[in-house]
Amino acid sequence: MRSCRALAMASKVYFHSVTVFEAVGGADTFKVLVERFYAGVAADPVLRAVYPEEDLSGATERLTLFLIQYWGGPDDYSARRGHPRLRLRHQRFAIGQVERDAWLRHMTAAVDSLDPAPDIRKSLIDYFETTSTAMINRPA
């Protein structure tokens, strides 16, 4: 398995000589993406069990910082929280195919709401599909 740093470096996909972070408009775009994603999560009975109410604002901040860093922005996530260790950090939640599919449905809707360029959309969705599948930690 590749290290997070290797994945972060691999994610610095360039479009016309800029990172995805720069191409989509920087931190503000990722803040909007995550806000729209969690609006869907908050209304989803499958995912509400995975996201405790008292931690939604913390989850929002963590995901925003992680995505900003992953897609080529500042390394604030790692500076505050250390190595992302995505699988380890998600082990305490029961994530099966149903939860993964619900998560991906809301993230895809949030991405599409931004109306990104097709090549950027593909990069984002490919990453979210792969990563959400890797978070599955219980059988179907």
Regions found by a protein language model. Name each.
Residues F21-A23:
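Short, motif-level signal for alpha-helix interfacial/capping segments enriched in acidic residues
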Residues A10-S17, K31-D112, P116-P118, I125, ...:
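Heme-based O2/NO sensor domains and their adjacent alpha-helical segments
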